[in-house]
Amino acid sequence: MEAERRSQPGKPKKGRVCSSLLLERHPASGTLTTMVDSSAPPSRKRPGAGVGRPRFSPQGGQRGRPHSRRRHRTTFSAVQLEQLESAFGRNQYPDIWARESLARDTGLSEARIQVWFQNRRAKQRKQERSLLQPLAHLSPATFSGFLPGSPAGPYSYTTPPPPVTCFPHPYSHDFPSQPSTGGTFALPHQSEDGYPTLHPAPAGHLPCPPPPPMLPLSLEPSKSWN
């Protein structure tokens, strides 16, 4: 038995662990393949390792977070505000020459003056919207009480005028009650001075238009009175 074991020195024994890498030549392709010992324990990675940790740049700051730029607020004196408000009242959109002239008077830069005018115009628009917002919810009937000649009260309405009564013409003629002969027109009643009697209509009413003239029933000549 010992002779057989000595005759096969390259055969590995059972139960031994090979820690080295073995290179063998593949018989078909002739390429070299690497054999790794499968008995070595695989490396285990902890879950969450390296996740969520901020990366720091060589300068000491965190990567991916830009530094917030601090804004420099300009404080205006009372004299400067008075000059700016006066210029805003004259012109809300000054050109470059007006801004440079105002910069020399106030001692500010032209860019600061331009930003101030932009903020001032935005403030004015906001004030105008706040003043018009309560009036937008009111209906047109609300303003009827504030019209001249209307009774007091924002929600009062004027009563409609009474219907107009039609009366005869103010200068109507009195026709005689005597029957007229055929084919003749009835003459109006004449007063002592020879003019027809006129009766005005009651005041406060509109007169009706006069009736159309009546056509003669016959064309016979008028008969004289006996």
UniProtKB/Swiss-Prot annotation:
GO terms for molecular function: DNA-binding transcription factor activity, RNA polymerase II-specific; RNA polymerase II cis-regulatory region sequence-specific DNA binding. Residues 69-128 bind DNA. The keyword DNA-binding applies. Residues 64-73 have a biased composition (Basic residues). InterPro entries: HD, Homeobox_CS, Homeodomain-like_sf, HTH_motif, PROP1. It is found in: Nucleus. Keywords: DNA-binding, Homeobox, Nucleus. Residues 1-73, 177-226 are annotated as: Disordered. Residues 216-226 have a biased composition (Low complexity). Residues 30-41 have a biased composition (Polar residues). PANTHER family: HOMEOBOX PROTEIN PROPHET OF PIT-1. Belongs to the paired homeobox family. This is Homeobox protein prophet of Pit-1. It comes from Sapajus apella. The lineage of its organism: Eukaryota, Metazoa, Chordata, Craniata, Vertebrata.
